[in-house]
Amino acid sequence: MHTSPHQAGFVTIIGKPNVGKSTLMNRLVGERLSIITPKAQTTRHSICGIVSDTDFQIIFTDTPGILKPAYELQESMMHMLQHALVDTDVLLWLVDIKEKEVPPIVEKVLAQGRIPVLLLINKIDLIAGQEALESLVEYWKQKVNVAQIIPIAALQGFQIEQLLKHILVYLPAHPPFYPKDMLTDRPERFFVAEIIREQILYKYQQEIPYAVEVVIEEFKEEASLIRISAMIYVEKKSQKGILIGKQGESLKQVGIAARQALEKFLEKQVFLQQHVKVLPGWRSQNKLLQRFGYES
């Protein structure tokens, strides 16, 4: 009996900040791997999520939002995005219902014609009626030459199963790259730091969330609990004061929320210690960015 060959490949998700890339990634993988907050530029690293079945394996990469870099950290984020495109087999280009322009990086990919591009129109639940949706799809058909245009609603999970089927059309025949039970190539410490950073993004406004880097200095698993010590770096003394808050109350609230999220993620009781340290101008220093795991 003839059986289809096993398929495996790399799929990169790109789009502007806050378009829903991390929500889509989490829907596709079925696990909460990417930080999701209402703030733009939430994703700083390329995060890999793996979906495996009997006859296929898809390695998804959620990338930082497309932006014009304002400092070294953002330069590094854009390097990561471009690096993710090098080995990708399929590109998922996510737009929302208000977008009308094609980012230069997407124009470049389309001009090369090497990678099939699936244009995903997200947040279609916010469109008033079928006619408006059809008009939007037609607009993009006239504007770009892509492999497919697929309307989705990532938050609600609409069209996600169908999207997986569309991706498999373009995925090459290949043995699995990772063990079938593996969900990501990132270590637990990475996600612990991201979960703490997520709570900071939720709680603080303006510049504070973007000046923060979280480093896990201790991750010790004991019989009944996991001991975690996190160092939170900021750029200015004033930011440290705001982060800690009056009598340490603000940081305490971050710690409570982070511990609850960590216990859910790690499925074990967590003892969390947090410290704050000033590291002047870390976002603009290549050596420090490399130390924190960003590409130069």
UniProtKB/Swiss-Prot annotation:
Residues 62-65 are annotated as: G3. CDD domains: Era (cd04163), KH-II_Era (cd22534). Residues 7-173 form the Era-type G domain. Keywords: Cell inner membrane, Cell membrane, Cytoplasm, GTP-binding, Membrane, Nucleotide-binding, Ribosome biogenesis, RNA-binding, rRNA-binding. Residues 122-125 are annotated as: G4. PROSITE patterns: G_ERA, KH_TYPE_2. One of its GO terms (molecular function) is GTP binding. One of its GO terms (cellular component) is cytosol. GO terms for biological process: ribosomal small subunit assembly. An essential GTPase that binds both GDP and GTP, with rapid nucleotide exchange. Plays a role in 16S rRNA processing and 30S ribosomal subunit biogenesis and possibly also in cell cycle regulation and energy metabolism. This is GTPase Era. It comes from Amoebophilus asiaticus (strain 5a2).
